[in-house]
């Protein structure tokens, strides 16, 4: 194929209930004195959740006391059993909680309680959970196997490799940040999604694309030719 190609992002809907004030309310219910990180998604080996667990095992005792990790999701029972076994083997039961599947408002509540969402996947085409966390005002760590370089470009998260040694550096950075710094990152992330991915904006891009196809006038800037 050598014709025009339109590059249009996935649309992201901002739930009416989810705001920065909503996040502030949710934060009241997190474990006091601890930073909370989380994974939310389908439990499958491609997600590399174990690399977060291995990163946590690299923390010293004092650092470990300041962190909790929630694994949110279901899917592959054998993979979940493997993760649970690794948590037990590394003696991380006090720091890691398996929550199970959540949806609806509870999903946004749990995202809002996090200091950061962790996405260490080997590969993601888009990773819808990334913008869902950002609209909650939650910073995101995402691996280089995801397309989310904008996290570092807009200073609303981390886009790095998914090796445990790298992930533990991100975790240590999170542990050193105060709540106002984390909130500022989250505000920048929410603004990024509103500016580039909000569903009304994407609908406008689709409108402009079809207008160009029908009239051949005013080719949109998101249409590329080889």
Where are these regions (language model features)?
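Short hydrophobic beta-strand element within catalytic cores of glycosyltransferases
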Residues: 139-143
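Carbohydrate-associated surface elements
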Residues: 11
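Nucleotide-activated donor-binding/catalytic signature segment of Leloir-type glycosyltransferases, i.e.
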Residues: 81-102
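Short alpha-helical donor nucleotide-sugar binding micro-motif in glycosyltransferases
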Residues: 101-102, 109-114
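A short, well-ordered alpha-helix in the C-terminal region of glycosyltransferases
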Residues: 181-196, 202-208
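Aromatic "clamp/platform" in nucleotide-sugar-dependent glycosyltransferases that forms part
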Residues: 122
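A conserved mid-protein helix/loop that constitutes part of the nucleotide-sugar donor-binding site
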Residues: 35, 39-58, 63, 69, ...
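Conserved acidic donor-binding segment of nucleotide-sugar-dependent glycosyltransferases
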Residues: 157-165, 174-179
């Amino acid at each position: 194929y050598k014709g025009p190609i339109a590059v249009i992002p996935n649309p992201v809907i901002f739930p009416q209930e989810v705001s920065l004030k909503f996040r502030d309310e949710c934060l009241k219910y997190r474990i006091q004195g601890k930073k909370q990180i989380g994974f939310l998604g389908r439990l499958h080996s491609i997600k590399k959740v174990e690399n977060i667990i291995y990163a946590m095992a690299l923390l010293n005792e004092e650092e470990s006391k300041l962190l909790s990790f929630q694994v949110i999701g279901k899917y592959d029972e054998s993979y979940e059993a493997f993760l649970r076994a690794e948590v037990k083997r590394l003696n991380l039961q006090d720091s890691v909680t398996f929550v199970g599947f959540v949806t609806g408002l509870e999903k946004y509540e749990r995202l809002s309680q996090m200091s950061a969402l962790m996405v260490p996947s080997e590969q993601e085409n888009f990773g819808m959970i990334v913008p869902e966390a950002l609209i909650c005002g939650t910073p995101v760590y995402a691996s280089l196997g995801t397309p989310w370089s904008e996290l570092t470009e807009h200073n609303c998260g981390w886009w790095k490799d998914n090796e445990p040694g790298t992930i533990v550096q991100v975790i240590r950075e999170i542990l050193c940040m105060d709540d106002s710094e984390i909130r500022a990152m989250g505000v920048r992330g929410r603004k990024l999604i509103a500016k580039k991915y909000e569903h009304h904006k994407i609908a406008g891009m689709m409108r402009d694309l079809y207008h160009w196809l029908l009239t051949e006038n005013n080719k949109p800037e998101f249409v590329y030719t080889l």
